[in-house]
Regions:
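Membrane-proximal intracellular helices of multi-pass ion channels
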Residues: 1-299
Protein backbone atom coordinates (compact mmCIF):
# COMPACT_ATOMS: atom_id res chain seq x y z
CA UNK A 1 0.00 0.00 0.00
CA UNK A 2 2.84 2.38 0.87
CA UNK A 3 4.59 1.52 -2.39
CA UNK A 4 1.38 2.25 -4.33
CA UNK A 5 0.96 5.61 -2.60
CA UNK A 6 4.58 6.51 -3.38
CA UNK A 7 4.10 5.61 -7.05
CA UNK A 8 0.85 7.62 -7.15
CA UNK A 9 2.62 10.66 -5.69
CA UNK A 10 5.36 10.32 -8.31
CA UNK A 11 2.72 10.63 -11.06
CA UNK A 12 0.50 13.32 -9.55
CA UNK A 13 1.50 16.03 -12.05
CA UNK A 14 1.11 13.54 -14.91
CA UNK A 15 -2.48 12.89 -13.82
CA UNK A 16 -3.07 16.61 -13.41
CA UNK A 17 -1.84 17.29 -16.96
CA UNK A 18 -3.91 14.46 -18.42
CA UNK A 19 -6.94 15.65 -16.47
CA UNK A 20 -6.54 19.20 -17.75
CA UNK A 21 -6.32 17.97 -21.36
CA UNK A 22 -9.41 15.79 -20.97
CA UNK A 23 -11.38 18.65 -19.41
CA UNK A 24 -10.37 20.99 -22.25
CA UNK A 25 -11.53 18.38 -24.76
CA UNK A 26 -14.82 18.08 -22.93
CA UNK A 27 -15.40 21.83 -22.95
CA UNK A 28 -14.40 22.01 -26.63
CA UNK A 29 -17.01 19.39 -27.51
CA UNK A 30 -19.72 21.72 -26.22
CA UNK A 31 -18.92 24.15 -29.06
CA UNK A 32 -20.11 21.84 -31.90
CA UNK A 33 -22.86 20.66 -29.54
CA UNK A 34 -24.22 24.21 -29.30
CA UNK A 35 -23.81 24.73 -33.05
CA UNK A 36 -25.70 21.50 -33.78
CA UNK A 37 -28.50 22.54 -31.44
CA UNK A 38 -28.75 25.87 -33.24
CA UNK A 39 -28.92 24.24 -36.68
CA UNK A 40 -31.16 21.35 -35.57
CA UNK A 41 -28.57 18.65 -36.21
CA UNK A 42 -27.76 15.58 -34.11
CA UNK A 43 -26.29 17.29 -31.07
CA UNK A 44 -26.14 14.25 -28.80
CA UNK A 45 -23.12 12.88 -30.70
CA UNK A 46 -21.09 15.68 -29.09
CA UNK A 47 -22.82 15.72 -25.70
CA UNK A 48 -22.02 12.09 -24.85
CA UNK A 49 -18.24 12.34 -25.40
CA UNK A 50 -18.22 15.79 -23.75
CA UNK A 51 -19.67 14.40 -20.52
CA UNK A 52 -17.33 11.40 -20.70
CA UNK A 53 -14.27 13.61 -21.28
CA UNK A 54 -15.10 15.94 -18.38
CA UNK A 55 -15.77 12.99 -16.05
CA UNK A 56 -12.47 11.44 -17.09
CA UNK A 57 -10.69 14.75 -16.63
CA UNK A 58 -12.09 15.28 -13.15
CA UNK A 59 -11.04 11.74 -12.19
CA UNK A 60 -7.50 12.29 -13.46
CA UNK A 61 -7.29 15.67 -11.73
CA UNK A 62 -8.40 14.06 -8.46
CA UNK A 63 -5.52 11.59 -8.74
CA UNK A 64 -3.13 14.53 -9.11
CA UNK A 65 -4.66 16.69 -6.40
CA UNK A 66 -1.58 16.46 -4.11
CA UNK A 67 0.92 18.04 -6.51
CA UNK A 68 3.43 20.00 -4.43
CA UNK A 69 6.69 19.38 -6.21
CA UNK A 70 8.51 19.66 -9.50
CA UNK A 71 7.61 17.56 -12.54
CA UNK A 72 10.07 14.74 -13.15
CA UNK A 73 11.41 13.37 -16.42
CA UNK A 74 9.32 10.19 -16.16
CA UNK A 75 6.08 12.15 -15.85
CA UNK A 76 6.94 14.46 -18.72
CA UNK A 77 7.89 11.62 -21.05
CA UNK A 78 4.79 9.62 -20.10
CA UNK A 79 2.53 12.60 -20.73
CA UNK A 80 4.03 13.28 -24.17
CA UNK A 81 3.47 9.64 -25.15
CA UNK A 82 -0.07 9.14 -23.80
CA UNK A 83 -1.68 12.54 -24.40
CA UNK A 84 -2.03 11.87 -28.14
CA UNK A 85 -3.99 8.59 -27.76
CA UNK A 86 -6.20 10.32 -25.19
CA UNK A 87 -6.98 13.20 -27.56
CA UNK A 88 -7.51 10.84 -30.48
CA UNK A 89 -9.87 8.46 -28.67
CA UNK A 90 -12.02 11.29 -27.34
CA UNK A 91 -11.91 13.05 -30.71
CA UNK A 92 -13.05 10.01 -32.70
CA UNK A 93 -16.29 9.47 -30.78
CA UNK A 94 -18.48 11.99 -32.69
CA UNK A 95 -17.49 10.36 -35.99
CA UNK A 96 -18.51 6.91 -34.75
CA UNK A 97 -21.72 8.08 -33.06
CA UNK A 98 -22.81 10.04 -36.14
CA UNK A 99 -22.41 6.98 -38.36
CA UNK A 100 -20.32 8.84 -40.91
CA UNK A 101 -17.35 6.60 -40.01
CA UNK A 102 -18.78 3.36 -38.67
CA UNK A 103 -15.42 1.59 -38.59
CA UNK A 104 -13.62 2.65 -35.38
CA UNK A 105 -10.26 2.29 -37.15
CA UNK A 106 -11.27 4.86 -39.77
CA UNK A 107 -12.61 7.19 -37.09
CA UNK A 108 -9.41 6.81 -35.06
CA UNK A 109 -7.31 7.59 -38.14
CA UNK A 110 -9.38 10.70 -38.84
CA UNK A 111 -8.98 11.86 -35.26
CA UNK A 112 -5.24 11.11 -35.11
CA UNK A 113 -4.67 12.96 -38.40
CA UNK A 114 -6.47 16.00 -36.97
CA UNK A 115 -4.86 16.19 -33.52
CA UNK A 116 -1.37 15.68 -34.97
CA UNK A 117 -2.10 18.55 -37.42
CA UNK A 118 -1.06 16.57 -40.50
CA UNK A 119 -3.77 18.18 -42.66
CA UNK A 120 -4.73 14.71 -43.95
CA UNK A 121 -8.36 13.58 -43.95
CA UNK A 122 -10.41 10.73 -45.36
CA UNK A 123 -13.55 12.91 -45.41
CA UNK A 124 -14.53 15.73 -47.74
CA UNK A 125 -15.45 18.56 -45.38
CA UNK A 126 -16.21 20.87 -48.29
CA UNK A 127 -19.26 18.80 -49.21
CA UNK A 128 -22.53 20.61 -48.86
CA UNK A 129 -24.23 17.69 -47.08
CA UNK A 130 -21.61 17.37 -44.33
CA UNK A 131 -22.91 18.16 -40.84
CA UNK A 132 -21.83 21.63 -39.73
CA UNK A 133 -21.05 20.23 -36.30
CA UNK A 134 -18.59 17.68 -37.71
CA UNK A 135 -16.92 20.31 -39.92
CA UNK A 136 -16.51 22.51 -36.86
CA UNK A 137 -15.28 19.60 -34.74
CA UNK A 138 -12.64 18.67 -37.32
CA UNK A 139 -11.32 22.24 -37.24
CA UNK A 140 -11.34 22.31 -33.43
CA UNK A 141 -9.45 19.00 -33.30
CA UNK A 142 -6.74 20.43 -35.56
CA UNK A 143 -6.61 23.61 -33.49
CA UNK A 144 -6.39 21.77 -30.18
CA UNK A 145 -3.64 19.56 -31.60
CA UNK A 146 -1.60 22.64 -32.47
CA UNK A 147 -2.26 24.09 -29.04
CA UNK A 148 -1.09 20.86 -27.43
CA UNK A 149 2.20 21.10 -29.31
CA UNK A 150 2.70 24.62 -27.96
CA UNK A 151 1.86 23.59 -24.39
CA UNK A 152 4.30 20.67 -24.56
CA UNK A 153 6.96 22.96 -26.02
CA UNK A 154 6.58 25.62 -23.35
CA UNK A 155 5.90 23.53 -20.24
CA UNK A 156 6.73 19.82 -20.41
CA UNK A 157 9.53 19.40 -22.95
CA UNK A 158 12.02 21.68 -21.16
CA UNK A 159 11.72 19.40 -18.12
CA UNK A 160 12.30 16.22 -20.13
CA UNK A 161 15.28 17.64 -22.02
CA UNK A 162 17.22 20.07 -19.86
CA UNK A 163 19.35 21.28 -22.74
CA UNK A 164 16.29 22.22 -24.78
CA UNK A 165 14.89 24.25 -21.90
CA UNK A 166 18.22 25.98 -21.26
CA UNK A 167 18.56 26.85 -24.95
CA UNK A 168 15.15 28.51 -25.02
CA UNK A 169 15.83 30.34 -21.78
CA UNK A 170 19.18 31.66 -22.95
CA UNK A 171 18.11 32.72 -26.44
CA UNK A 172 14.61 33.95 -25.77
CA UNK A 173 15.05 35.16 -22.17
CA UNK A 174 12.02 33.14 -21.07
CA UNK A 175 12.36 31.29 -17.78
CA UNK A 176 10.72 27.86 -17.62
CA UNK A 177 9.92 26.66 -14.13
CA UNK A 178 8.81 23.10 -13.40
CA UNK A 179 6.48 24.28 -10.66
CA UNK A 180 2.86 23.78 -11.65
CA UNK A 181 1.74 27.41 -11.41
CA UNK A 182 4.67 28.47 -13.60
CA UNK A 183 3.77 25.73 -16.09
CA UNK A 184 0.19 26.99 -16.13
CA UNK A 185 1.43 30.54 -16.73
CA UNK A 186 3.58 29.41 -19.67
CA UNK A 187 0.59 27.52 -21.09
CA UNK A 188 -1.58 30.64 -20.81
CA UNK A 189 1.05 32.68 -22.62
CA UNK A 190 1.26 30.14 -25.44
CA UNK A 191 -2.52 30.00 -25.66
CA UNK A 192 -2.75 33.79 -25.85
CA UNK A 193 -0.36 33.99 -28.80
CA UNK A 194 -2.00 31.04 -30.58
CA UNK A 195 -5.51 32.45 -30.11
CA UNK A 196 -4.41 35.92 -31.26
CA UNK A 197 -2.86 34.57 -34.46
CA UNK A 198 -6.02 32.53 -35.08
CA UNK A 199 -8.18 35.62 -34.63
CA UNK A 200 -5.99 37.53 -37.09
CA UNK A 201 -6.29 34.71 -39.63
CA UNK A 202 -10.07 34.70 -39.10
CA UNK A 203 -10.24 38.41 -39.90
CA UNK A 204 -8.13 37.89 -43.03
CA UNK A 205 -10.44 35.15 -44.30
CA UNK A 206 -13.45 37.29 -43.43
CA UNK A 207 -12.03 40.23 -45.39
CA UNK A 208 -11.38 37.86 -48.31
CA UNK A 209 -15.09 37.16 -48.62
CA UNK A 210 -15.71 34.01 -46.58
CA UNK A 211 -18.73 33.76 -44.30
CA UNK A 212 -17.97 33.75 -40.55
CA UNK A 213 -18.35 29.98 -40.14
CA UNK A 214 -16.05 29.15 -43.07
CA UNK A 215 -13.57 31.84 -42.02
CA UNK A 216 -13.40 30.39 -38.51
CA UNK A 217 -12.95 26.76 -39.59
CA UNK A 218 -10.35 27.65 -42.21
CA UNK A 219 -8.44 29.85 -39.75
CA UNK A 220 -8.24 27.07 -37.15
CA UNK A 221 -7.07 24.49 -39.70
CA UNK A 222 -4.58 26.84 -41.35
CA UNK A 223 -2.96 28.00 -38.10
CA UNK A 224 -2.64 24.47 -36.74
CA UNK A 225 -1.43 22.64 -39.86
CA UNK A 226 0.25 25.57 -41.69
CA UNK A 227 -2.02 24.85 -44.64
CA UNK A 228 -5.36 23.30 -45.50
CA UNK A 229 -6.67 19.78 -45.93
CA UNK A 230 -8.91 21.02 -48.75
CA UNK A 231 -6.93 22.52 -51.65
CA UNK A 232 -10.03 22.20 -53.82
CA UNK A 233 -11.74 24.62 -51.45
CA UNK A 234 -9.55 27.43 -52.79
CA UNK A 235 -9.30 26.21 -56.39
CA UNK A 236 -13.08 26.14 -56.76
CA UNK A 237 -13.37 29.79 -55.71
CA UNK A 238 -10.44 31.05 -57.82
CA UNK A 239 -10.13 34.11 -55.58
CA UNK A 240 -6.85 36.02 -55.30
CA UNK A 241 -7.88 37.73 -51.99
CA UNK A 242 -8.74 34.32 -50.52
CA UNK A 243 -5.41 32.85 -51.62
CA UNK A 244 -3.58 35.86 -50.17
CA UNK A 245 -5.43 35.43 -46.87
CA UNK A 246 -4.45 31.76 -46.81
CA UNK A 247 -0.83 32.55 -47.66
CA UNK A 248 -0.49 35.19 -44.94
CA UNK A 249 -2.14 32.85 -42.44
CA UNK A 250 0.32 30.10 -43.36
CA UNK A 251 3.21 32.50 -42.76
CA UNK A 252 1.75 33.48 -39.38
CA UNK A 253 1.45 29.82 -38.40
CA UNK A 254 5.19 29.38 -38.90
CA UNK A 255 6.12 32.06 -36.36
CA UNK A 256 7.70 31.12 -33.05
CA UNK A 257 4.91 31.64 -30.45
CA UNK A 258 7.45 32.08 -27.66
CA UNK A 259 9.16 34.86 -29.59
CA UNK A 260 5.78 36.49 -30.32
CA UNK A 261 4.94 36.47 -26.61
CA UNK A 262 8.32 37.97 -25.72
CA UNK A 263 7.82 40.81 -28.23
CA UNK A 264 4.27 41.42 -26.98
CA UNK A 265 5.30 41.33 -23.32
CA UNK A 266 8.04 43.90 -23.92
CA UNK A 267 6.00 45.88 -26.47
CA UNK A 268 8.93 45.70 -28.87
CA UNK A 269 8.34 44.67 -32.48
CA UNK A 270 12.01 45.45 -33.13
CA UNK A 271 12.83 42.50 -30.88
CA UNK A 272 11.27 40.16 -33.43
CA UNK A 273 13.02 41.81 -36.37
CA UNK A 274 16.41 41.28 -34.71
CA UNK A 275 15.76 37.59 -34.05
CA UNK A 276 18.01 35.30 -36.11
CA UNK A 277 15.34 32.61 -36.42
CA UNK A 278 12.78 35.03 -37.84
CA UNK A 279 15.34 36.52 -40.22
CA UNK A 280 16.19 33.05 -41.54
CA UNK A 281 12.48 32.24 -41.86
CA UNK A 282 11.76 35.41 -43.84
CA UNK A 283 14.86 34.97 -45.99
CA UNK A 284 13.95 31.39 -46.85
CA UNK A 285 10.44 32.46 -47.80
CA UNK A 286 11.64 35.30 -50.03
CA UNK A 287 14.28 33.20 -51.79
CA UNK A 288 12.01 30.20 -52.37
CA UNK A 289 9.16 32.49 -53.46
CA UNK A 290 11.44 34.23 -55.96
CA UNK A 291 12.60 30.88 -57.36
CA UNK A 292 9.02 29.64 -57.76
CA UNK A 293 7.98 32.92 -59.44
CA UNK A 294 10.99 32.75 -61.78
CA UNK A 295 10.14 29.17 -62.74
CA UNK A 296 6.51 30.08 -63.42
CA UNK A 297 7.57 33.03 -65.59
CA UNK A 298 9.77 30.73 -67.65
CA UNK A 299 6.89 28.39 -68.40
Amino acid sequence: MIKFQRRKRQLDIFWLLMGSVAEIMGLALFVPFADSLLWHEESWIFLVPAVLAIALGLSFSWLGRDHKRQINVWEGALFMVLVWPLLSILGMMPYVLSGILVNPVDAFFESVAAVTTTGVSCLDYARGDMMRGLVLWHSILNWLGGLNFIIILSTVLPQVSGCFGLTLSARQSIFFSPVWNKMAESARQGFGVYASLTALSFLLYLAAGLDPFSALTQAMVTLSSSGSAEPGYFLARDSIPLELAAGISMLLSGLNPLLCWKAWDRLSFRLMLRDTELQAYAGLFLVSGALVAWNLCRT
